[in-house]
Amino acid sequence: MMNVFDLFKRRSSAPVARERLQVLLAYERRNRSQPDLVSILREEIMAVIAKHVQIDQDYLQVSMDRGETMSTLEIDIQIPNKSAVPMAIAG
């Protein structure tokens, strides 16, 4: 049962990102002629990741394979290990 106060709770970013991706993929299925959907997805995915991890844009690859009945979205992200990222020294 849904509580009225649940409508005002802040949702975590993962479910929100997943919901946005599902909406975009559903839209893409209806409008297959839109060529730059992959670039839109890439920008939105990069924005979500940048909120949590600092990565170079060159390390994010997004591709879409469009089939007759199904489209496949492939996302390749190289995230540096925490030990490889230099820490700022507090002064």
Swiss-Prot record:
Write down the Gene3D superfamilies for this protein, in alphabetical order.
Cell division topological specificity factor MinE (3.30.1070.10)
Alphabetical UniProt keywords: Cell cycle, Cell division
Q: Which SUPFAM superfamilies match?
A: Cell division protein MinE topological specificity domain
* Record Pfam families: MinE
What is any one GO biological process for this UniProt entry? cell division
Span-the-membrane segments of this chain are none
Q: Which family does it belong to?
A: Belongs to the MinE family.
**NCBIfam families attached here?**
minE, PRK00296.1
Function summary: Prevents the cell division inhibition by proteins MinC and MinD at internal division sites while permitting inhibition at polar sites. This ensures cell division at the proper site by restricting the formation of a division septum at the midpoint of the long axis of the cell.
The protein in question is named Cell division topological specificity factor
* Organism, as annotated: Mesorhizobium japonicum (strain LMG 29417 / CECT 9101 / MAFF 303099)
Gene name, Swiss-Prot/TrEMBL:
minE
